């Protein structure tokens, strides 16, 4: 799923950070920046280093204290993403039990007071005393970081957790945790208040005949840590549906016991369609695993399959400690949707398993096409982009010792994964082609059509470039470039309309800020072929300005700006234009998003012109009302008649206003776009850019209240 994260400070006009700020306040501010991943510990050491540094200055953070001081290091953030991550930590433990073959059903409940309960039918956390610890296994995993079965020799062969911190981190960031274990014939219970057990683990009632073993964890997130403690049903639902797809046969249930406060829930079969109604339980179980997943994704894309059935196969190598499941189906769509996972973790940056898949697929299709005479000697080989056009695929590998790397630790690095997946693809898909020659021919014919479109688009681009002899360095006419050639400090503002573009050009910092005005709405790349897309002057201008190319040939090292900022009006039309731009980046320049180079500017809706003191820019009607009430409560006043200025569009702002509100790094708000779950993001883009109005309406209605962190 794609999220936008606030990265630039919210500063009122004229405000300054005084030099006299106390050391204590500086430390507090620095700690908050660490939690929000804006400052590393090393930078903190450099910026706040005392003049004297002795042993007495050293501080060792014991146990869960470190988690509470820097929660962002353990769960990513203290915003909604981090809050939901707490639930995933507990559920991941239950999934580990399922992967080990001991659990078959996980039940998650959102309680009326926004507590969370997770119940599984696994083996139950060990209740015996842990040697050397002097306390039970339950208390050990609740209070010690990196304590659990995944750190020993024989607890789990495969584990889904990246960090393995799990339940102890949930305890660290909760006001209360209730735990119940069904094991060794009894119910065992323990309660934790503010991270500490209220009593030792208690042996309770005997288990009844036929009652399964397992673990129940109920927790309440700490409102002093998190910006919000209100869970989003759809976020959890989407995640658990994906978990069910990736763990064949595992049943996952989600129940929301809160009263629903608004109409319009997009979940089919979920009864929360009227205010006051309670969410019903949704349950997911897929006996065909990722084969069902691909079938589901194809239906979401509303694309027509090229072959009738989803192609799927699986393999295992006990010696290497790796297994793989692969499922795929070609469709009439123009973009590919290949999603990869390692130990059920979404590897949004790809990795060695995806490299093996791509290499084998391209090689196999070309070899088969030549062997069957479909490709002639004079024909050039089909590219990877050609072969994968319209392909929906899921690759899921499970490894004993996964190695994650990349920008966000979501890129698989195990070399054995590449060779294994490549071998499996070559053997299994080769056999499928031999057994289904008619379907194989259709797949290859589609790739040949994609190749022709690609070559036609390339020729059109070359013709355009030959005509554009007056363009400097081949850059688009409309681009007003910046003076700096250092990509790390350069920003490209992609601006809706010539009027706003003119204001942006006047108001910008010409040293580091480039402006590219785009006239009207760009082509919907979700539903356009490559040659049609590349015939669009608007899209060609954007791709040329960015500098990295597109598709399989995209080269992140050639990108000319490390901030690509989409700047559109703060209304529905502006949101649509921003989404069209994001679709282009997601489908054809995705490494830009993965690298953290894509942003959305947040122009204000209102300016409150106080008679005394700095003016305030606000971004929603609700924020206007709140800031207005707070200001009046503090004795502030607005001039009559013109105290509240509403901005109807970027083009209505003067260049000074555009600079002050939307472009000045000291005052602006930017949302950084990043992909947490590529498959969910793919589903969202397909829905937003598709033909059906109703799912889009429901999505917007449900997310209207969450515009500050809405899925892009």
Question: What is each model feature region?
Answer:
Residues 77, 128-133, 353, 384, ...:
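Conserved, non-catalytic sequence blocks in retroelement Pol enzymes and Pol-derived host proteins
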Residues 68, 125-148:
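Short conserved segment of the HATPase_c
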Residues 52-70:
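Mature N-terminal segment immediately following signal peptide/propeptide cleavage
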Residues 3-6, 452-471, 486-491, 502, ...:
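C-terminal interaction appendages of subunits in large macromolecular complexes
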Residues 96-97, 124-125, 572-573:
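Residues immediately C-terminal
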Residues 2-51, 64, 88, 96-98, ...:
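GHKL-family ATPase ATP-binding module
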Residues 69-87:
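Conserved short strand/loop->alpha-helix "switch" segment adjacent to the catalytic nucleotide/phosphoryl-transfer site
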